[in-house]
Amino acid sequence: LHHIKNAAKKLLKNDFIIVTMNHRSSYDHTFPAQIHDVKAAIRFLKGNSEALNIDPNFIVVQGYSSGGHLAAFMGASSGKTKFNLNGKEIDLEGSLGNHLDQNGDVHAVVDWYGPVDLQQMDDCRDVVRPKRNEDARSLLIGGPIAENKTLTQLVSPVTYLDSKTPPFLIFHGAKDTAVPVCQSEILH
């Protein structure tokens, strides 16, 4: 955590504002609850931008591992409120909070080793992992990955990438055994 503190200090010295946010866990709530929570936090920041001295036109999200997944999802889904895949529609924005006149769009993403294509997590893995990783993905979507292909695609940030996707800065260690490096290579 020391490197995070140092980076945060440098950002603060250069007039950046840092906000940490909580979201519902996949142990208690399935997708898209987590996305709705983060989008609500972004809307709150935009709705209170004057009081908080925030530029609502330059909001960057950052996350590590599962937080990287959320950050990547936030960037990839920016500009989209609903999405339909194979007849299943998903509300990407949600309706939490008091600032529904704002949107949850972000303008850049810093993704630290976040999974971006949950369907391909095991296909490009050099190391065989215990079942717990499958279980984490299954918790997120509320069922087995193999039996929920459409929902697995809907929870994967790569599904939403297009020419309007904001810029990404991606970090990933080549020896990561939890999230295979191919997940970041997919974004590159």
Name these PLM-found stretches:
Residues 1-188:
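Alpha/beta-hydrolase superfamily serine-hydrolase fold, recognizing
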